[in-house]
Regions:
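Acidic/His-rich structured neighborhood in mature extracellular/periplasmic domains
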Residues: 72-194, 212, 219, 241, ...
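Glycine-rich, acidic and aromatic/proline-enriched surface loops and short helix-turn segments
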Residues: 64-74
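Sec-dependent signal peptide recognition
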Residues: 1-9
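Solvent-exposed, acidic/flexible segments
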Residues: 37, 41, 55-63, 90-101, ...
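Acidic/histidine-rich, surface-exposed loop or edge segments in extracytoplasmic proteins
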Residues: 30, 38-50, 76-90
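C-terminal motif of bacterial Sec signal peptides marking the signal peptidase cleavage site
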Residues: 13-14
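Short alpha-helix capping/helix-loop boundary micro-motifs
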Residues: 195-207, 223
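Low-complexity, Gly/Ser/Thr/Pro-rich intrinsically disordered linker/tail segments
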Residues: 210-218, 222, 229-230, 234-305
Length: 305
């Protein structure tokens, strides 16, 4: 029986023992040594604040933040609205992986923000029409949704750049059908049509020198007579002053010359043809200028479900 008090004391001592100390947060110098896609949200928030404080030029900040993600693994169709909406379980942000749209949106949102909380708000302001979160208000269509609803951020200058060499294509968008078939969501939208200008691939070299860090790139593809924006990314300036394409594509985020990108696409086209598959061909590019003196508009109130 004398063992009982001893055992009781041991149990009490175990319950009252001090937990091990939490690991010390990294210094900003240590955080700066990590690629962005390996940072925790807390570290990313401190990195965002550091960039806002130490790089006042928005264009240079966009280029630096985008390059901080070089090597980030690529995953297609990465984000959704979970847990705000439960039509799928895809999250509303991702630091570890990206696709082309996710990479561009996260880079812009981080460059425009001072901390993690503002980044998350800014990301939704960019991803959704008027910043109202929902699968029906997400900017699904690059030309008619993303480019238009983010006119406060970027302006399409494709026709201006191309001049007499400008090309265009008609685009018809049926959002109701898209939401019903792709997201099992019923929503009523009118069918919309537009005429989209772009720079043909044969004339891209002639306009590259007019582009700046942070400008938005839409890659225009064609197949079976239809044209659409199949890929997006950012313009960055190389050390020699030439313009490169910073983008997320399998297997990872990379910075490459536009010549290298077009060669990579041409190789894919040749492979598709050799395999007897319908060939998705590169037609050209749309270029959207990052606006000067950006004023971020407020988001509309989130409606009650």
């Amino acid at each position: 029986m004398r063992l009982l008090p001893v055992l009781f004391s041991v149990l009490i001592a175990g319950c009252a023992s001090v937990p091990p100390p939490a690991p010390q947060p990294l210094t900003i110098e240590q955080i700066l040594q990590k690629p962005l896609y390996q940072m925790t949200p807390q570290e990313a928030g401190r990195y965002i604040n550091h960039m806002q404080t130490n790089e006042p030029d928005l264009r240079k900040r966009i280029a630096a933040i985008g390059r901080k993600n070089i090597g980030q693994p690529y995953v297609l169709n990465l984000l959704g609205e979970f847990p705000f909406q439960i039509h799928d379980e895809l999250p509303m942000f991702s630091l570890t992986h990206s696709d082309c749209v996710v990479f561009s949106e996260h880079t812009y949102a981080m460059a425009l923000s001072r901390n993690w909380e503002e980044f998350f708000w800014m990301l939704q302001r960019i991803r959704y029409k008027d910043g109202v979160i929902g699968v029906a208000t997400r900017n699904h269509y690059t030309e008619q949704d993303w480019n238009i609803n983010n006119r406060w951020l970027v302006t399409d200058i494709s026709a201006q750049l191309a001049g007499a060499n400008v090309a265009s294509y008609p685009l018809t968008v049926d959002r109701s059908r898209f939401l019903r078939t792709r997201h099992h969501t019923e929503a009523s939208f009118p069918v919309t049509k537009s005429d989209e200008a772009y720079v043909p691939k044969e004339h891209v070299k002639e306009v590259l020198a007019q582009l700046n860090d942070g400008d938005f790139v839409n890659v225009i593809s064609t197949r079976n007579g239809e044209y659409w924006a199949s890929h997006v990314g950012l313009v960055v300036t190389a050390p020699d002053g030439s313009r490169n394409f910073l983008n997320s594509a399998a297997p990872q985020v990379r910075e490459e010359t536009f010549d290298a990108f077009m060669a990579r696409v041409a190789a894919r086209e040749a492979q598709q043809a050799a395999e007897g598959k319908p060939v998705q061909q590169l037609a050209g590019f749309k270029f959207l200028r990052l606006n000067d003196n950006i004023v971020v508009p407020p988001a509309l109130p989130q409606p009650r479900p």
